[in-house]
Amino acid sequence: MLVILKENIRTLGKLGEIVKVKPGYARNFLFPQRKAVKATKESIAKLEEQRSFLEEENIRKLNLASELAASFAGKFVILVKQASEDGKIFGSVTTREVARSLSQEYEVDHRKISFNGVKIRNLGEYQASIEFHSEIVVQVAVHVVRSETDAHELRQVKSQSQKSQQQEAKQNEVGEATDSDKADQK
């Protein structure tokens, strides 16, 4: 089945492209979420009329997503789970749990989060991908710990490391400013 994409979809193509997909994928996913329309002469003509509006809308969404992604720099999630002595947790970590943990500061749809094919069933540190836009994906560290005390200690370590990184960045900015001042004087 030929469809016209109404937005960029990483696995299919860009806005306005005509692509061939399986009928079930179109009926069950693309059409209900208004990501595509069936390619007919009428829909192609209508798309040409709306192309500039759709492109502007896509740029607006991209800008919003990039601002949101920038605010996620250095973010991490700590989840407390019951685990056996060898570190295996009872059950597994889900995207809903990560979204719930992030919801204290941000509103993130759990369907936009993935663990890159990894099942989180042990204690430790993992990476989760959050897709804000088809072109913008942010990595967030997910720490799975056994107790609240472990979580508290990890938060302290992370906050100290972030403070030291911020101080280093400020020192680098000051160093660059003095280097440029010296270059201007010569």
Swiss-Prot record:
GO molecular function: rRNA binding; structural constituent of ribosome
Domain of life: Bacteria
Keyword rRNA-binding: yes
Example of a GO biological process term: translation
Biased composition (Low complexity): 157-169
Positions of the UniProt region annotated as Disordered: 153-186
InterPro entries per UniProt: Ribosomal_bL9 (IPR000244), Ribosomal_bL9/RNase_H1_N (IPR009027), Ribosomal_bL9_bac/chp (IPR020594), Ribosomal_bL9_C (IPR020069), Ribosomal_bL9_C_sf (IPR036791), Ribosomal_bL9_N (IPR020070), Ribosomal_bL9_N_sf (IPR036935)
Described function: Binds to the 23S rRNA.
NCBIfam families assigned to the protein according to its UniProt record, in alphabetical order: L9
Protein name: Large ribosomal subunit protein bL9
Organism: Wolbachia sp. subsp. Brugia malayi (strain TRS)
